[in-house]
C-alpha cells in the first residue's frame, strides 16, 4: 500500500520538500543553517506573538509594558529574552549561511541567491523596527538616527523622513507604525523563505566540491533530518546559555532608561549585527555618500555572481581565493568592532581603511585571485 505521505496532496508537498527530497551525499554541517534559520523564524514568530499579547505600542506606556512583561507575566522574562537573543542567533545563522554561499559558490543559483538577498533586507528591516519597540533611550535615538538617513535623498529627503515619522520627530505615530510593520514582516519573510526553497529545489543543493551531485544522491530523511536536529540542539544550547546566564550581554544598558528626546546618549549605536554596515556609513564624511555606501555594503551581494571569474564553482581547491575570502571575514569582524567604538582617533582611520578594503576585496581582489588561479591551472 502506498504511504499517505505520497498520496495526500498536502502531505505530498511536505514529502517532496523534507522527506523524499534527493540530497547530495557529501554536504557538510555548513548546509545546516537553512533549517536553523527556519527554526529561528518559528521561534521569533511564536515568542513575538506572546509578547504582542501584553505589549502596548504607545509612547507613554510602551516602556512600562515591557517592564510589566518581564516582572508580572508568567514566564514573561524568558519569552522576552528568547525573542531578543533569538534575533541575535537568527543573524549569526544568517551571516554563516551567506558566508557558506560565498565560499562554495552557491550564488550561481541566481533565483535562490536573489530571493536570499531580499530575505536578508526584510530581516534587517524587521530587526531594526523591533529594536525601537521597547522605547528605551537606544531604541528612540537609534530610530531617530537611522530614519534620518532618508533626509540624504536629494529634493524629497525631508518630506520622506517626516512621512516615515508621521510627524516632525520620532513619536507615538512612529512607534505605532513600526509595531505594525514589525508584526507583519515575519509572515512576509515566511512566504519569501518558501519561495527561496522553491527555487532551491528547482536546481537541487550545491555541495562542497562544487561539482554535479546528480549521480550520487541520498534521501533527505533520515540522513539530513538527524543531522539538522543535532544542529538544532547545538543552537538551542547556545541560545539557552545566553538567555539563562547573561541575557543582556548583547543588548545596550541605555535601553533600560526610558526614551527621552531631551537627553542624547553618549554613543548612539544599533544592535551588534548592524555594526559592520554602521561602521561603513560613519566612514564616509558626506551624508549622501555614507548612505549609498551603507546600501551598497548589502546590495553588493547581488553583484557577486557577475564578479565570479573562476572556472570552478567552489573555493575548496582555490587557495588564493580562500585567502581573499578569509581577508573579507576578518575585515567584517574589524568593521563590527569599529561600529561599536566612539567616533575618535584611531577608530575613524581604522574604519575608513576597513571600509575601503571591504569593497576592494569583493570588487577587485576576489575576481583577480580567481583569474590568477585560472592562469596557474591553464584554464584560460
Swiss-Prot record:
Keyword Iron-sulfur tagged: no
Residues spanning the membrane: 33-53, 77-98, 113-133, 178-198, 226-246, 288-308, 320-340, 347-367
Cofactor(s) annotated in UniProt: heme b
UniProt-annotated binding residues for heme b b566: 97, 196
Residues binding a ubiquinone: 201
Gene Ontology, cellular component aspect: mitochondrial inner membrane; respiratory chain complex III
CDD domains: cytochrome_b_C, Cytochrome_b_N
PROSITE patterns: CYTB_CTER, CYTB_NTER
Localization, UniProt: Mitochondrion inner membrane
A GO biological process held by the record: mitochondrial electron transport, ubiquinol to cytochrome c
UniProt entry keywords in alphabetical sequence: Electron transport, Heme, Iron, Membrane, Metal-binding, Mitochondrion, Mitochondrion inner membrane, Respiratory chain, Transmembrane, Transmembrane helix, Transport, Ubiquinone
Cofactor binding annotation: Binds 2 heme b groups non-covalently.
Residues annotated as binding heme b b562: 83, 182
Biological role stated in the UniProt entry: Component of the ubiquinol-cytochrome c reductase complex (complex III or cytochrome b-c1 complex) that is part of the mitochondrial respiratory chain. The b-c1 complex mediates electron transfer from ubiquinol to cytochrome c. Contributes to the generation of a proton gradient across the mitochondrial membrane that is then used for ATP synthesis.
Other noteworthy facts: Heme 1 (or BL or b562) is low-potential and absorbs at about 562 nm, and heme 2 (or BH or b566) is high-potential and absorbs at about 566 nm.
Assembly, per entry: The cytochrome bc1 complex contains 11 subunits: 3 respiratory subunits (MT-CYB, CYC1 and UQCRFS1), 2 core proteins (UQCRC1 and UQCRC2) and 6 low-molecular weight proteins (UQCRH/QCR6, UQCRB/QCR7, UQCRQ/QCR8, UQCR10/QCR9, UQCR11/QCR10 and a cleavage product of UQCRFS1). This cytochrome bc1 complex then forms a dimer.
Protein name: Cytochrome b
